[in-house]
Amino acid sequence: MEAGPVSAVVGRFAPSPSGRLHLGNLACSLLAWLSAKSRGGRIVLRIEDLDAERCPRKYADQLEEDLGWLGLFWDEGGSKGGPHEPYYQSECSGIYTESYKKLEAMGLVYPCFCSRSQLHAASAPHTSDGNVIYPGTCRGLTAEEIAEKRKKKAPAYRLMVPDENITFTDGCMGEYAENLLRDCGDFYLRRADGVFAYQLAVVVDDARMGVTEVVRGADLLSSTARQLYLYRLLGLPAPKFAHCPLLLASDGRRLSKRDGDQSLENLRARYTAEDIVGRLAYAYGLQEEPAPRTPESLIKDFSWDKVPKKDICLPEGLFE
């Protein structure tokens, strides 16, 4: 697999269509759009529906309609198509297999028979995004042990990582460093049911689509070291990263798709698109009052220097 052609700045929307968009998703999408468009860049829409059963196509269609309603238009991808198809991860298994086999040929992939409950029972430490840091239980299994375990259970597959520090400068959060072995651990490349893992899929897709900048939530900051390692192993150009602060409910809870009152489905009944965009711009420091705005009108006001570095609690009454 070769990286796609790069022309200036290429950002992306990469939502998982497992439900309707909420304010946190919208904020990241707005910042990604503004970051690219403020420098004359393009936006790719990729639908991250790796787990197709949890991500019915109707949600992807609704997601496109919602983004368009807000004025967050993209240049290629989704149902619009373009030169880097497919744009739905559920259609990319063959592409991921090619990169997976390269890693396998390096001797870095091994089968893992551990269940999530076993790892939690072992009190393994957790990464900052809540995942268990794998203690390497299956890393040294012999061929005989693997064959015996296969009789009882299909394995998932992990990538072996070195004891190495990965450092980078985040466009929003600044300097960041993680040790691959201590802070991340060997991580999944493929589930036992054959579905490829997020870490591999996003690296392969961002490279082949020519993405030069990844803007996403700060909850994914700790995924970046693993992804930079994959870019290096696969010989692919890595994009720049900017992780925006998470949007929290006024009581400090992290917003999720379960927060129906903050879903775009409900917000559209109470606010115009310009109302929502303007209020989000205010929450993220792009304007001094929550006045209605279009994304286009915010381009001249955008700067990462204005965006807070810490998670943002929605001001009481901003979205009633």
Predicted regions and their residues:
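Catalytic adenosine-cofactor/nucleotide-binding cores of aminoacyl-tRNA synthetases and other
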Residues: Y110, S115, S222-S223, L233-E320
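Alpha-helix boundary recognition
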Residues: K101-A105, A207, R268, A281
